[in-house]
Regions:
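Conserved structural scaffold segments of CAZyme catalytic domains across common CAZy folds
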Residues: 93-101, 105-115, 130, 134-136, ...
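The substrate-binding groove and active-site-proximal loops of carbohydrate-active enzymes
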Residues: 316-328, 349-362, 410-429, 460-474
Length: 674
């Protein structure tokens, strides 16, 4: 009997100890993703894409939580100074952890690096929330120390595994693509980083996409962020041979991995509190379009600045011409050429100059605009609110003090003036809005300086903005206010040059500024917004075919040996044929939804194609032979077996399509469901 009592007591003791034992891990999990965190130090130790089975992060020993840069530097840069003073989250005291309602909150207090003698009075509260598609990271930094905080890495993922080593793994944005595996692109030079490193800037690049042919994940901000974020990948410990990733899991006892960080550039000063911009970590299964679908459907528009109307004339397929003038007579001459050559819109530069702090129109511009418009030619003026000529009269007195400077007080360049400066914001409105031509023209296209010379932020102490204020914040403020003030009537357009896709909430369209490899991505991100594509002399036919493929307006930029339109008869003829084709079959090619490659199969050498879906659900396939020398036989199959017809820019009457067609070099064909 005594033995039974002792056994029962021991059993209950074990159960009690088990019941009170703290869990070793904390999970956020749904049918899409599983994220596992260390319950003591807060490190992310596993991430699994449950739909594809991709173990994005799987080696627990590589778990990371956050990083923070606290530069320790004085005016003399003594031996005690250390600019690269990185606080690593996994080396801090264990955080306070709270879990509730699909969210985990980690609170780290008193931060210290290996180079600091004592803890800094800094609190970092990091939150991870489970969403229906993945994770959302947000946070708050409270700095009561004497040290500045330049960035916070959150999330910080210790490894991004390669899901299938038989195919490449890429990281890309709306304008760029690089390999992560098997070749890792070292963007910053061997002298500037500890490991091969590749970075992209958000929100300028819209999103970060990591993918192979079958799966991927997206990193992006849903709303326009306050701070700049630099996403970074590091190949640790380095290359197997030049530019090539190691295939092994370890090299000389060092774990091989690709480490990922989202670095929030906050430039927090002592005594400040900074809220991190929420950032999404979203997973998907499928090709790249599935990831872009998630981004474009999830991004929140700038409703506070959203454009009120879209001019109806911009909805039609139009042929544009980019010109530069010195006076009103030049514009009249170009207008007459446009009338003969089938050009609908003139995109005009050179129409103003800046002298002694004032923006001045060229002579005769207003009458010239009126004359062009009377002949049915629309006039759109190119603008650049915050770029000035350093050699112009009055530059030093009016603009030199407003150039943007880096953290060491050195100008990035001398022609981009700071858009975050209140005085410049007032100058832009007072000088540009007084110009009659801007109000008379059919619209304007503004060219922001697109971070020329790495001018991402300004650190001038006398510009009346926060040190390290992102350039984009000032640009967006000026762009929105100018668009509102110049709206005029429902037929006036405001256009940009694709600097950041949040501008599409302000502007009616944009001139694409990317390589032709990314035209389809730009079009897929917004299938209907007007996009213009520059056509230069030496690649004219290729570029016009790209415009046809991607539902973009042709913009002639013809100045190879002169600027007379009649001296480029073949280019003009093909451009007119494309516009006529798009007008004839507008329901298939223009008033239709771009669907990339989905819904059709095209076989043949040197071919590119795009699928369009009409409002009634019918499909059209545009096929282009990209070879400059060889014919190509295009075999096209649509999966529903309906009767098909085809037409070309040169022969626009539809003919029965019997499954294949021969395409001459640099030629196009449209296959349509009847």
């Amino acid at each position: 009997m005594r033995k039974k009592v002792l056994f029962i007591c021991a059993l209950f003791g074990e159960i009690s100890a088990f019941a009170t034992q703290e869990p070793k891990t904390l999970n956020l999990e749904n049918g899409c993703i599983e994220a596992v965190f260390d319950a003591k130090n807060g490190a992310l130790i596993r991430v699994t894409d449950k739909k594809s089975g991709w173990e994005i992060m799987k080696r627990e020993a590589l778990g990371q939580s956050f990083e923070m840069l606290l530069p320790m530097e004085g005016t003399q840069m003594t031996q005690a100074d250390r600019r690269y003073n990185v606080v690593k989250g996994i080396k801090q005291d264990n955080p306070e952890i709270k879990q509730a309602d699909n969210k985990i909150t980690f609170i780290w207090k008193g931060l210290k690096s290996d180079f600091m003698d004592q803890k800094a009075d800094i609190t970092f509260k990091g939150e991870v929330r489970l969403t229906d598609k993945g994770l959302e990271y947000s946070g708050e930094v409270i700095n009561n120390s004497q040290l500045p905080i330049e960035y916070v890495s959150w999330p910080c993922i210790g490894e991004v595994t390669v899901p299938d080593k038989t195919q490449p793994l890429y990281h890309s944005t709306r304008n760029d693509q690089r390999e992560l595996f098997p070749h890792f692109f070292n963007q910053h030079g061997y002298w500037g980083v500890d490991y091969p490193t590749s970075t992209y800037v958000l929100p300028e690049k819209s999103f970060l996409q990591v993918n192979d042919r079958e799966r991927g994940f997206m990193v992006y901000h849903r709303e326009m962020p306050k701070y700049m974020t630099i996403t970074s990948f590091e190949l640790i410990p380095g290359y197997e041979i030049r530019g090539v990733n190691p295939y092994e899991d370890e090299i000389d006892g060092e774990m091989v991995r690709i480490q990922f960080k989202a670095n929030h550039i906050i430039f927090n000063k002592p005594g400040e509190t900074s809220e991190l911009d929420p950032i999404q970590f979203i997973i998907y299964k499928g090709d790249w379009t599935k990831g872009v679908d998630l981004y474009r459907n999830d991004r929140i528009a700038l409703t506070a600045h959203q454009r009120d109307t879209d001019p109806k004339w911009l909805d039609s397929p139009l042929t544009w011409r980019k010109i530069s003038i010195g006076n009103g007579k030049d514009l009249v001459r170009y207008g007459k050429e446009a009338l003969k050559g089938g050009v609908d819109v003139l995109l005009v530069s050179g129409w103003y100059r800046i002298e002694n702090g004032h923006v001045l129109e060229v002579l005769g511009l207003e009458d010239a605009i009126t004359e062009c418009q009377s002949q049915g030619i629309r006039v759109v003026l190119e603008t650049n609110w915050t770029t000035v000529d350093r050699h112009s009269a009055g530059y030093r007195e009016n603009f030199r003090k407003y150039v943007m400077v880096d953290p060491f007080d050195m100008p990035y360049n001398f022609h981009n003036i700071c858009p975050n400066t209140p005085n410049i914001q007032k100058w832009v409105k007072s000088e540009w809005l007084k110009l009659p031509a801007l109000h008379m023209a059919d619209g304007y296209m503004n060219s922001d300086f697109n971070h020329n010379n790495k001018s991402f932020m300004c650190f001038d102490k006398f510009h009346q903005h926060r040190l390290g204020e992102p350039t984009l914040n000032g640009i967006m403020k000026i762009d929105a206010e100018m668009a509102k003030n110049l709206a005029g009537n429902t037929e006036k357009v405001a256009l940009g040059q694709g600097f950041v896709d949040y501008q599409n909430d302000i502007y009616n369209g944009y001139l694409v500024n990317a390589s032709d490899n990314f035209y389809a991505l730009h079009r897929y991100m917004d299938t209907l917004i007007p996009i213009m594509l520059r056509v230069e002399v030496r690649n004219a036919r290729k570029a016009m075919n790209e415009a046809l493929l991607n539902r973009m307006n042709i913009v002639y930029d013809l100045n190879f040996f002169n600027d007379n339109l009649e001296d480029y008869p073949n280019i003009v003829k093909y451009g007119n044929q494309i516009e006529d084709l798009r007008n004839k079959y507008a329901g298939y090619l223009w008033n239709a939804t771009f669907n990339e490659h989905h819904g059709a199969s095209v076989q043949g050498n040197n071919l590119e194609y795009a699928v369009f879906i009409t409002k009634s659900g019918k499909r059209a396939v545009v096929v282009v032979n990209k070879s400059v020398n060889d014919n190509s036989k295009a075999e096209v199959v649509l999966d529903n077996g309906k009767a098909l017809v085809y037409a070309t820019p040169e022969s626009q009457e539809s003919k029965t399509f019997n499954g294949s067609v021969e395409l001459a070099p640099l030629s196009a064909v449209v296959i349509m469901e009847k």
